[in-house]
Amino acid sequence: MKKSPTNWFKFSLSLVIFLLVRLIPFRPPNIEPILAAQMPLAGVYGARAGFLFGVLSILFYDIFTQTLGPWSILTAGAYGLLGLGAAFYLRNKKSIRSYVGFAIMGTIFFDAVTMLTGPLFFNQPLLLALTGQISFTALHLLGNISFAVFLSPVIYSLLAPDKNPKITQAVSLINPKII
C-alpha cells in the first residue's frame, strides 16, 4: 500500500466500519462483509493491505469481544491468505463478475480450511463437522455473493473512483446521483 495519508485513512476507516458492522447483535455469524471489503482493498492497495485487513479484522473483533484464542489465529490466517489471493486474482480483473467469482472461491476455501481444522481444535468427529458445515457454507456463500454484487463495487468506487468504468457504471445504476 502506498504510504499516502488518504490511503491509510481509508484503510483504517474500513477496519473500524466493518468491525462495527460485525458487532451488530443477532446477525448470523457467517453473513458478514469482511470479504466484500477485503477484495476492493486488496485490488486497490495491494497484497499487503489485503492480508492486513483480513488478519486485523479477525484479531480486532476477537480482542474486542474477548474471544481471542487459538481459533483466532487460524481464522485470521485464513482471511489473510484470502487477502493475498484477492490481490493477485483481482489484479487485472475489476468487475462485479470477478468479485463474485472470488467470493465463491474464497468462501469455499475459508469454509473448507475451518471445517477441516475445527475437529482438531474441538475433538469433533469429522462427519459431524462436515454435516454442520453444509448449511453454514450455503449461508456464507449467499451472504458473500450478495455483498460481492452490491457492496464491493461501492467500496471500490470510494477507494478508486476513476480506475474502472465498469464498476463505476454498476454503482451509478444503483444510485444515479453518483455520476
What are the roles of these predicted feature ranges?
Residues 2-5, 39, 88-99, 161-162:
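Membrane-interface helix-boundary motifs at transmembrane edges
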Residues 17, 21-22, 53, 57, ...:
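Alpha-helical transmembrane segments of multipass membrane proteins
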Residues 18-33, 56-89:
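Interfacial aromatic-anchored transmembrane helix boundaries in multi-pass membrane proteins
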Residues 21-25, 45-52, 84-100, 139:
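Hydrophobic alpha-helical transmembrane segments
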Residues 25-26, 46, 65-69, 90-91, ...:
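Short helix-capping/hinge motifs at transmembrane helix termini and TM-loop junctions
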Residues 73, 94-179:
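Membrane-embedded alpha-helical hairpins and interfacial helices in multi-pass inner-membrane proteins
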